[in-house]
Amino acid sequence: MSAEHVLTMLNEHEVKFVDLRFTDTKGKEQHVTIPAHQVNAEFFEEGKMFDGSSIGGWKGINESDMVLMPDASTAVIDPFFADSTLIIRCDILEPGTLQGYDRDPRSIAKRAEDYLRATGIADTVLFGPEPEFFLFDDIRFGASISGSHVAIDDIEGAWNSSTKYEGGNKGHRPGVKGGYFPVPPVDSAQDIRSEMCLVMEQMGLVVEAHHHEVATAGQNEVATRFNTMTKKADEIQIYKYVVHNVAHRFGKTATFMPKPMFGDNGSGMHCHMSLAKNGTNLFSGDKYAGLSEQALYYIGGVIKHAKAINALANPTTNSYKRLVPGYEAPVMLAYSARNRSASIRIPVVASPKARRIEVRFPDPAANPYLCFAALLMAGLDGIKNKIHPGEAMDKNLYDLPPEEAKEIPQVAGSLEEALNALDLDREFLKAGGVFTDEAIDAYIALRREEDDRVRMTPHPVEFELYYSV
């Protein structure tokens, strides 16, 4: 879509406002809204100035001016605002050079795709992420000097089997780890997910399926079709926006926290990916599980750099409450056909054209632009340096005897470990100027602040364990 087409849309849809959106370092969408009459052809060349010092991990107050540069191809009508509003996604540019800001996640993703093409290895990378989420009826939490608390409730929660409701308790709720694929009334979110699908398609996503997920208390997934990397990261931001707002309309609250509840499955964001050149799938070949040698090297790069990738793909302290054995969490850095206990799976496909790999450790708290770019850069490093991943592991890795299990590397066990790994293993990200040291250092500092706060805050479980010592 061109700027000319956007200007036509403004008239055809009688648009009153234009909502300029961008993504901060942590992955949260931000926006500023302007009257539609301010948008003309020059707007798409000049952009809009804003204060970059107010975004965590970005500019200092002494050099705060930055440019929001609209990408006309992303224009879409907002389905939620009362007044007709057009959303346009923006890149963050330096005002002096009009080059992409080195800490802007979307600019980083675009540089990664440019680097892919510059290597000559491939011209396209396709991503198919699968973010999961919870829908709750009520959530209360807080942390202050006088104490900490969190309380989750949902009518689907297994703990509500004996709860007294005004209209009676109707039962029909999924048990712990019992939520995968039941029909209503056990699956209480059917209509909510259907509405999410309709709105997502209205906003340009292609929906393939939706269903209840494994956990009790409203764990769900909407599956959407793959796309090229930056476009798919854009779509993940739309996906989250739709899930949050449709849930809100239904009187629910949605969360993409990786592990909101102890004792049941957490939410992942498995990432399917493949490389293509001139329309040919480069991951299809005659090696293990129908993969090419390039695909194996790509896997080798992801495994080699996995702990550094964790800092971007599993970016919260909560992420590592999911990455523990026993809850379908892919902690073992191995690859296998069909085997879901491995961190990298090769799905069964109907055609060699669909051959791909699935990296299973990322979670939906990740900034999609940074997560996808890191996975791509690790894979390209594997191809360039011919890093073979070793033999495939086709056995259930959760059932291995301890002496065998300790020989298999694992993902990072904490955010601190992941950030330390990123600090020491960053050169693969800097190839082609995709990530800079400044961007990586700022990211690490931002996440260490969160890690320090969690580490220093007394936890309710500590009172259970230690109050009476």
From Swiss-Prot:
Query: Top-level EC class, please?
Result: ligase
Give the keywords, sorted. ATP-binding, Cytoplasm, Ligase, Magnesium, Manganese, Metal-binding, Nucleotide-binding, Phosphoprotein
Binding-site residues, Mn(2+) 1: 130, 270, 358
Lineage of producing organism: Bacteria, Pseudomonadati, Pseudomonadota, Gammaproteobacteria, Enterobacterales
Name of the protein in its database record:
Glutamine synthetase
Gene from which this protein is expressed: glnA
The protein's job, in short, is: Catalyzes the ATP-dependent biosynthesis of glutamine from glutamate and ammonia.
Molecular-function GO term, any one:
ATP binding
Organism, by scientific name, is Salmonella typhimurium (strain LT2 / SGSC1412 / ATCC 700720)
GO biological process, alphabetically ordered = glutamine biosynthetic process; nitrogen utilization; protein homooligomerization
